[in-house]
């Protein structure tokens, strides 16, 4: 049975509101970019994800780090809208399924890695995922590993973007003390940089709930030296936006084309406006 989101998306797309939303977004400026966040892309969903990539490639430019920085400086890649595709949680499918398909289309992925998940012995990774709110499908592999390996992370960094997604996949709530924030943010950044032998300038907050954001975590992210930081509060990216408050919109590999169109339409941005403004005020550092 279709979910409520699928049914709503189908109705809105049938009414043409998805196309109207894209046109309205385009009228607000010469170019705009939307960041999407994915999680697990299991092998049985590879064809679905490939269809989504084909849909994106027909309509959007792919944005990497240099493209995004140029946009912030007022130099969009082209007159077409852009997309940033991010993949959270350091899952094995990101190397096995996602990266080869992205490369087939000539697209760049942004992979957000929680350090401790990669460090966890394979036989303990399912338990770690359950204890730290990392969702995954029931993959059938020849071994117990469900996380990226460090070799995977290094390989991804060669053609894609690797960002920090905390140490333990922890929501950076107001309840965390200074020691916990040190572990989750600067320590995780240093470890990724040591493994990759290159700077890691990109961060992604864990969780989209309002309580998952805090002023002190925002200051630590800024002080640690990150210059791009992703949240999940639904808004397009435009020149002049705060680079440590980049909003994302959730899409998953199993979402129908109607759901994808709905998520891209900007209609959800309106519903998230009040929350987004509260979170942005809370996490303003510059």
Tell me the role of every PLM-derived stretch.
Residues 89-96, 101:
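Short acidic, Gly/Ser-rich segments with clustered Asp/Glu that frequently serve as metal-coordination loops
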Residues 1-86, 92, 175-286:
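C-terminal active-site subregion of NodB/CE4 polysaccharide deacetylases
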Residues 52-59, 101-105, 159:
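A short, Lys/Arg-enriched amphipathic alpha-helix followed by its capping loop at the start of a domain
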Residues 36-39, 80-83, 103-211, 246:
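Metal-dependent polysaccharide deacetylase catalytic core of the NodB/CE4 family, i.e.
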Residues 75, 95-98, 121-125:
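Short, conserved acidic/polar surface loops in the N-terminal third of protein domains
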